[in-house]
Amino acid sequence: MPNAPQVHISEVGPRDGLQSVQTVMSTADKCRWIDALAAAGLREIEVGSFVPARLLPQMADVAEVVGHARTLPGLCVMALVPNRRGAQAALAAGVHKLTLPVSASEAHSLANVRKTRGQMLAELREVIALRNAEAPG
């Protein structure tokens, strides 16, 4: 179909699906889950969050999960980062894309990342500067 729209699918389950559950999934199970998602044809997966393990123990192994995901041919590996420190760790681990939560409402921003929208926009500028310095293009 020459005029068919392009649809971009970005799977976030390994991050969003795990961050609010109490039980910590093993690293091996996370890697198997990502393998299955990639085998199903997904080409972009948000595999975790680079956040302090004391806040989200489910994400304590995110660098290892990124390392595994990077071995899958053709997979774009994404991770959520709440700030410059998280972005530094994510880039060091080898992610291809970063996502940063900038909320539409002040209340959600404070509940989600304990920062105002203005503070998150400042974080976004810092993350962009870091990305431009370390991984331009």
Role assignments for model-derived ranges:
Residues 9-31, 75-84, 109-115:
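Active-site mouth loops of central-metabolism enzymes
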Residues 3-11, 30-48, 53-60:
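N-terminal glycine-rich anion-binding loops that anchor highly charged ligand groups
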Residues 4-7, 41-43, 71-77, 94-96, ...:
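Short, well-ordered coil/turn segments that N-cap beta-strands
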Residues 43-68, 101-116:
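Glycine-rich, proline-tolerant flexible connector loops at the mouths of alpha/beta enzymes
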